Amino acid sequence: MDLQPRLVHADCSVHAQHPVVLAAAVAALLMHAPSAAAQISVEVSPLRIELTAGPGSTTTQAITVANAGKDPIRVRAVATDWDLAKDGAPQFEGVAEGGPYSATSWIRVAPPEQVIEPAKEMTVRFSLAVPPGIQAGGYRTGVLFEFGPVTTNPAARGRDVMFKSRIATLIYVSIGQPAMAAEMTDLGVRNTGTQTQVVATIRNSSRRYVRTRGTLVLYDQSGRNVREVPVPDVPLLPESEREVAISLVDPDKQLTVAPGDYKVEVRIDVGLPALLVGETSLKVLK
């Protein structure tokens, strides 16, 4: 496949602004370890919490953790800062604490540690108190759950039992309605093995958190619409840049494109009066 010259622009004539309901969101991170993690089976719900709040407001939310395995597990719950990599992967290691959009100091988590028996569940609650006079914007925090085996060995407890698996519930807290400002800075094609993705790079220069929506349209040389693919619903953090990857060819998902020359048009709604629109050319070889 060959990517030809591209065009990225805003289309003011196609789409009027739709209000975007902002709240607090949660995404998940699961880390596997070879031995103990293989014996642990847990379910955390919800994995995304979206909240809208105002300065000085408070709320309490619940998260359910279920032990679907055959052995008791020990669960730790801690408030954590996090960020997104450019490809959208949640990042916890090396993230600066108390950044400009951190809400971690606003929350308290209880209980901090508990044992869950097989086929049982526990409820972890967090209380969030928004500071008075906080500036409007899209803030974030998370509750990180660490899972490990249960031991009654005092020596092992003294060494602090290794926690082998982690899942994070990501929490987005939207305060007010700051003005939205974003642009599509690039549109490219990424080939990975048998998969082909169209990748739009979006820069959010505002203080607002939004989620993307939209459509990729594939046109043949005659201008005929041969396929429409929805843009993934992914978070766009304040004052950040990220890639939005749209799968076009994926044999595992039975997505194929016949050989030929195509025009690719991507339209993304981020809550602006106009859609973000990018165009590029795609050549599919035999």
Regions found by a protein language model. Give the residues of each.
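N-terminal signal peptide c-region/cleavage motif recognized by signal peptidases
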Residues: 32-34
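Beta-sheet-dominated interaction scaffolds and their linkers
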Residues: 39-71, 111-113, 182-199
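Surface-exposed binding patches on compact interaction domains or structured appendages
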Residues: 40-46, 69-126, 213, 220-226
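A short beta-strand micro-motif common to beta-rich folds, especially ectodomain repeats
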Residues: 63, 126, 137-148
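Short proline/glycine- and polar residue-rich coil/turn motifs
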Residues: 114-121, 233-242, 274
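Short, surface-exposed loop/turn segments at beta-strand-coil junctions that are enriched for proline
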Residues: 129-135, 249-256
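A short tyrosine-centered beta-strand micro-motif
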Residues: 139, 143, 257-268
